[in-house]
Amino acid sequence: MDVGESNERVKDDSALQASPRSPLSSIDLAIDGAMNASIEQLYHNVCEMESSDDQSPSRASFISYGAESRIDLELRHLVGDVGEEGESKKEIILEKKEESNGEGSLSQKKPLSNGKKVAKTSPNNPKMPGSRISSRKSPDLGKVSVDEESPELGVVLLKQARELVSSGENLNKALDLALRAVKVFEKCGEGEKQLGLNLVMSLHILAAIYAGLGRYNDAVPVLERSIEIPMIEDGEDHALAKFAGCMQLGDMYGLMGQVENSIMLYTAGLEIQRQVLGESDARVGETCRYLAEAHVQAMQFEEASRLCQMALDIHKENGAAATASIEEAADRKLMGLICDAKGDYEVALEHYVLASMAMSSQNHREDVAAVDCSIGDAYMSLARFDEAIFAYQKALAVFKQGKGETHSSVALVYVRLADLYNKIGKTRDSKSYCENALKIYLKPTPGTPMEEVATGFIEISAIYQSMNELDQALKLLRRALKIYANAPGQQNTIAGIEAQMGVVTYMMGNYSESYDIFKSAISKFRNSGEKKTALFGIALNQMGLACVQRYAINEAADLFEEAKTILEKECGPYHPDTLAVYSNLAGTYDAMGRLDDAIEILEYVVGTREEKLGTANPEVEDEKQRLAALLKEAGRGRSKRNRALLTLLDNNPEIANGQRPVY
């Protein structure tokens, strides 16, 4: 069962990169270290605000969206499309401050304080939400008592909080200090624009500490408030402070699994940045790429492609004429991933090669190795296996030399090679690479994100499943599930793993157990609050098959019908996954005595398969025989007994050997 091998790679790459803000980041990026770096940068910016009157140091934090000083928690470690139960969509503030004689409007753009005119918003982009978030304070703020009202005290408190976070000694103490700093800036900053920015900065740091403690629900109202304070017409610094809050809140929603809310915040942040910096600023290009990666994680490839092309065009315009910049290389790597997911493997390969050349020219060896893995993926999709092996071995050598032989990036390449050798029938070599990868994943090096380990288990499980070693496959899926147990914002990921476990138990003939596992997975998908994806549709189809084996025919029909509706919308009526559901639904209708409906669906399936696969294809021939049998029975007025459902249902391609997992 799968949603396409290329889509699986998207999930894999997303997990490896950790945060779409850093497509070139190393594979072993850790959350804690990234958060510490962000805290230090935020504190540095606050200190600069106190010591310089010539230039607002908040600009160093908010304008620059690059690696040097971006407001980036690097906390977004998505392995799948995940969601929280019952969360409502949030609307963000992007409105002008009310004037004494009336309200401002986003459409009434004014020159910024430095004389720079605001660029017009592109009509092709979504309009920014205009409704205000209700002002919400963290419940902890009311417990803080601060007598002093000097802004210098706030800076000192933030410094102490930063030192505690950096040392990792006591995040709770750091939280107390950050809360006191916020209270100080609240008392002394009323009516002072510059001190208002101090408050915004302290709120960002407070939210980062909440995130480090896993208190995402407490971080959200803090960030909402940080967006509410700065007003766009107060100047560039304030507008970009609002931008930073949008991006950080988007990260937080991503952590909580609310992907649609996350994308909405990123889109709003991009619109603010474009207004302030103009359409062609390089930093706007970086944000376009960031938003594109978020769309990739949501499997929204067309929108991702559009945004990535915007980023590529901007970075081309800002780069040197002779050589491609590292930013352009990152854009091309992402564009290759998007094209790969869409099945455009030749185009993907072209982008990967250009990205690799640009990175090589600037001695980014490990980044080149990561791209070599993607090049190997494209070659494997094109059945150019020798070239794929060469690309993987090249990446493997670099990772071993640069990161060590027990690093998770080495294990990742082992898994790629295991998959390749399995595809070409070299089972012994495939098992050897699986075992080498498992040795690393079972004893990961310190600092390895456990999400990477879980992803590795899922990948290797799929290979064992295709070898029909189902016990080992199920064992690894259970290990992966244990890693995600009780993790916040991972409901969809857990549901995907459970769905794959349902497939394996189905293949083992444990139909009742398979049904129960699918039921749990479907429940999690329904409660996630996210839109229904192709993954959900495939899981419904599989649960329907389990119902067939348990002779729950009516329930099976309901599940197939729901799966049909979802897959028609997400994949289209000609996609193999959709056709598989049509075929299953036709068999179910026949078993229920709805012969005319069954014939109508099966005629469509046969016609489509003939058009796409050719009349000589074995799959087409089998469908034609099924249709002929139904027509013959309809001609003689079938009334007394129905053909057994299990003889009519085609072997589902989703659970055939050699398929990739759903997650």
Curated annotation (Swiss-Prot):
<feature type="repeat" description="TPR 8">
    <location>
        <begin position="454"/>
        <end position="487"/>
    </location>
</feature>
<feature type="compositionally biased region" description="Basic and acidic residues">
    <location>
        <begin position="1"/>
        <end position="14"/>
    </location>
</feature>
<feature type="compositionally biased region" description="Basic and acidic residues">
    <location>
        <begin position="86"/>
        <end position="100"/>
    </location>
</feature>
<feature type="repeat" description="TPR 4">
    <location>
        <begin position="285"/>
        <end position="318"/>
    </location>
</feature>
<feature type="region of interest" description="Disordered">
    <location>
        <begin position="1"/>
        <end position="24"/>
    </location>
</feature>
<feature type="repeat" description="TPR 3">
    <location>
        <begin position="243"/>
        <end position="276"/>
    </location>
</feature>
<feature type="repeat" description="TPR 1">
    <location>
        <begin position="147"/>
        <end position="181"/>
    </location>
</feature>
<feature type="repeat" description="TPR 5">
    <location>
        <begin position="329"/>
        <end position="363"/>
    </location>
</feature>
<comment type="similarity">
    <text>Belongs to the kinesin light chain family.</text>
</comment>
<dbReference type="GO" id="GO:0009860">
    <property type="term" value="P:pollen tube growth"/>
</dbReference>
<dbReference type="InterPro" id="IPR011990">
    <property type="entry name" value="TPR-like_helical_dom_sf"/>
</dbReference>
<feature type="repeat" description="TPR 9">
    <location>
        <begin position="495"/>
        <end position="528"/>
    </location>
</feature>
<feature type="repeat" description="TPR 7">
    <location>
        <begin position="411"/>
        <end position="444"/>
    </location>
</feature>
<keyword id="KW-0677">Repeat</keyword>
<dbReference type="Pfam" id="PF13424">
    <property type="entry name" value="TPR_12"/>
</dbReference>
<dbReference type="Pfam" id="PF13374">
    <property type="entry name" value="TPR_10"/>
</dbReference>
<feature type="repeat" description="TPR 11">
    <location>
        <begin position="579"/>
        <end position="612"/>
    </location>
</feature>
<feature type="repeat" description="TPR 10">
    <location>
        <begin position="537"/>
        <end position="570"/>
    </location>
</feature>
<dbReference type="InterPro" id="IPR019734">
    <property type="entry name" value="TPR_rpt"/>
</dbReference>
<keyword id="KW-0597">Phosphoprotein</keyword>
<protein>
    <recommendedName>
        <fullName>Protein KINESIN LIGHT CHAIN-RELATED 2</fullName>
    </recommendedName>
</protein>
<feature type="compositionally biased region" description="Polar residues">
    <location>
        <begin position="102"/>
        <end position="111"/>
    </location>
</feature>
<feature type="region of interest" description="Disordered">
    <location>
        <begin position="86"/>
        <end position="146"/>
    </location>
</feature>
<feature type="repeat" description="TPR 6">
    <location>
        <begin position="369"/>
        <end position="402"/>
    </location>
</feature>
<keyword id="KW-0802">TPR repeat</keyword>
<dbReference type="GO" id="GO:0031347">
    <property type="term" value="P:regulation of defense response"/>
</dbReference>
<feature type="repeat" description="TPR 2">
    <location>
        <begin position="200"/>
        <end position="233"/>
    </location>
</feature>
<feature type="modified residue" description="Phosphoserine">
    <location>
        <position position="19"/>
    </location>
</feature>
